[in-house]
């Protein structure tokens, strides 16, 4: 279950960074 949540969060993070490159670069 933890692995599933890890992969889910990783996928969401990848999509968020892809859709918001400016936010990623400003971190």
From Swiss-Prot:
Keyword terms, alphabetized: Chloroplast, Plastid
Stated name of the protein: Uncharacterized 3.3 kDa protein in rpl11-trnW intergenic region
GO CC entries: chloroplast
Localization terms from the record: Plastid, Chloroplast
Main location: plastid
Domain of life: Eukaryota
Keyword flag Plastid: yes
Protein source organism: Trieres chinensis (Marine centric diatom)
């Amino acid at each position: 279950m933890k692995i599933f949540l890890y992969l889910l969060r990783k996928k969401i993070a990848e999509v968020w960074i892809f859709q918001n490159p400016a936010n990623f670069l400003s971190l």
